[in-house]
Swiss-Prot record:
Keyword DNA repair: no
Species of the source: Arabidopsis thaliana
E.C. designation(s): 3.6.5.-
Function: Tubulin is the major constituent of microtubules, a cylinder consisting of laterally associated linear protofilaments composed of alpha- and beta-tubulin heterodimers. Microtubules grow by the addition of GTP-tubulin dimers to the microtubule end, where a stabilizing cap forms. Below the cap, tubulin dimers are in GDP-bound state, owing to GTPase activity of alpha-tubulin.
Identification of the protein by name: Tubulin alpha-6 chain
Amino acid sequence: MRECISIHIGQAGIQVGNACWELYCLEHGIQPDGQMPGDKTVGGGDDAFNTFFSETGAGKHVPRAVFVDLEPTVIDEVRTGTYRQLFHPEQLISGKEDAANNFARGHYTIGKEIVDLCLDRIRKLADNCTGLQGFLVFNAVGGGTGSGLGSLLLERLSVDYGKKSKLGFTVYPSPQVSTSVVEPYNSVLSTHSLLEHTDVSILLDNEAIYDICRRSLNIERPTYTNLNRLVSQVISSLTASLRFDGALNVDVTEFQTNLVPYPRIHFMLSSYAPVISAEKAFHEQLSVAEITNSAFEPASMMAKCDPRHGKYMACCLMYRGDVVPKDVNAAVGTIKTKRTIQFVDWCPTGFKCGINYQPPTVVPGGDLAKVQRAVCMISNSTSVAEVFSRIDHKFDLMYAKRAFVHWYVGEGMEEGEFSEAREDLAALEKDYEEVGAEGGDDEDDEGEEY
C-alpha cells in the first residue's frame, strides 16, 4: 500500500483537517463512528481508501492523521464533535498554553515540549503502514503554532523520514484581511523552513477563498466553515487518485516530479471548478472545456495573485467524475492556443492530467452543488512571487523599526534569524524572477492580450 499520513497543526490546520476528514468519510461511506457498511474485507485489505484509513480488527476505520495544537480549545471541538469516535484519543494532541501568535514560542519554548510526543504518535502511525508514501502537512504560517511548531515538526520529519515526500497545504496571510499584527514575521520565519523541508507547498489564502465564496456561491458573509469546505474539495481532488482507482492516476511523488523544476521553486497555486451554488447548477451542465477554462481564471485561484502577471512552468489537472481522456486532451489543446495563458519558454508541454471516475461528493447542507464532473488545478507559476513580495514588504516595514522583535528574542530566538530568513526569501523572489526570464526574448508583447 502507498499510505499517506496527514498532520494538522494549529487552529487553521485542524479546522481544514476537520473539513477534509468529513468529506473523505462521505466519499467512502464511512460513518462518524468509523464503521463502513460497504467494506467487505475485514482487516487491512487492499482497498484504495486504506491509504488514508487504517482498519482495526473490529472493522473500525481510523484516519491516518495527527492533530496537534498548543492550546486545547480547537482540539476539544474535535473531541466533542460529530466525528469524535472516528479518531483515536492519542491522535489528538493538545498542550496547555498557546503560542500567542509568536513563532518563537511555537518553535522554541512551548513547541519544544510537545514535539517529541507528536513524533512518537507519527512513528506509531508510520509503523502501521506497509509502504509509507509521505506526509500531508496542514498549517497556517500567520499564527504562532502553525508557523513555529509547524516548522519544527517539518524539520524533525526531515531527519526521521528523509526520503519521504512532504506536501504542505499552507494558509498564507491575505493582502487585506489580517488576523494578527505579527503575521509577516511568522510567515517569513516559517517560509524559511518550508523552503527547505517541504517538497511541494500549496498556497491558500483566506481572502481569495472569501472572494470565491462571495462571487460564485453568493454567500454574503462567508464563515471559516464555508472556506474550509471549499479547500477540502481541492485537497480531496488531489488525493482522490490515492483513494480511488481511476483512468490516469497521480501519485504524491508524481506531483513533485511534474511540478517542481528546481527544488526551491515548489510553491503552487490551486484552483477548483466548478464552484457553483445548488440553485445555479440546476440550470447549467458544465462541459470539460468549460470547467478547464474556469480553472485557469485568475478569479478561481485560491491565493491572491494574478497568474497573468507571470508565466506557468507546469500545471497538474485532476479531473473527477464523468470525464474521458479525449475531452481532456481537447480542453488542454484549447488552453495551449490561448495567448493569455503563457508558459515559460523552456517548458513547452507543461500539463500533467489525472482522471478519476469518482464524481465529486458534496457535504449535505453545504454550499456547493452536486455536479457530474469537476477539476482541480495545481499550477506552478512565477506569479506566486507576488505573495512573497507582499509579505516581505510588510516584514521590512516592521523590522526596520525592530517592532515586536523583543517578544521573539525573549523566547530564545536570536535577531540574526530574522535577517537570515528575510535574506532567504529575497533569494526566493530572485529565483522566481530568473525562472520567468526569457532566453533573450523581449517582454513587450504582453500588453495587448488582456
